[in-house]
Amino acid sequence: MIWIAAAFFVTALILLLIHGRRHLRAGLPAGELVYLDVASEQPSVLVSRRYGLKGKPDALVRIPSGDVIPVERKKTRAPKRPYAGDLIQAAAYCVLVEEQYGRTPPFMRIQYTDRHFDEPYTIERKQWVLRTCQEIRQARQSGACDRSHAIPAKCRNCGQRANCDQAL
């Protein structure tokens, strides 16, 4: 009987270690995995009717404090500091998490291939997201949405190139 209990304990320990390694290897903070965007799962789109915002984070993790943290995973090496576009995307997920779960995430994680950044989610970042959303809405309404050609390679490789009247 003791051998069965010992075998059960060892098996549980091994499974726990495997799960923990996968969690860390995926670049996720310690905690309960609430959602992970993988092809086999239905997408978990978060919606804010209040702000007219939708988004699908790469992962959501409930950390030991009970807060839900959005994780944005990138397929590139980390810059010295997170790119502004990556920051605002992760901050937008924080706005969505805040509305969906009723708690403000203390930080957001941006995971690059070689390292991650845990960036604080502040009222200033929330205001940045909301201001940017408003600017986008105004630009769409006015029809003044010129494409950025600051990086010509992005234009050449864009999936909408064939439909774009501003392609290089």
Per-region residue spans from a language model:
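Active-site metal-binding core of divalent-cation-utilizing nuclease and nuclease-like domains
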Residues: G31-S65
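N-terminal signal-anchor transmembrane alpha helix of single-pass membrane proteins
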Residues: M1-A30
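Metal-dependent nuclease catalytic regions and adjoining charged, substrate-binding loops involved
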Residues: S44, S48-R50, E99-L168
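A generic structural signal for short coil/turn motifs at secondary-structure boundaries
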Residues: A78-P82, D118-P120
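Conserved catalytic cores of phosphodiester-cleaving nucleases, focusing on short active-site segments
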Residues: G55-P79, Q89-V95
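Metal-dependent nuclease catalytic cores in nucleic-acid-processing enzymes
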Residues: G85-F107
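A short, polar/proline- and glycine-enriched secondary-structure boundary/capping micro-motif
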Residues: K80-A84, V129-R131
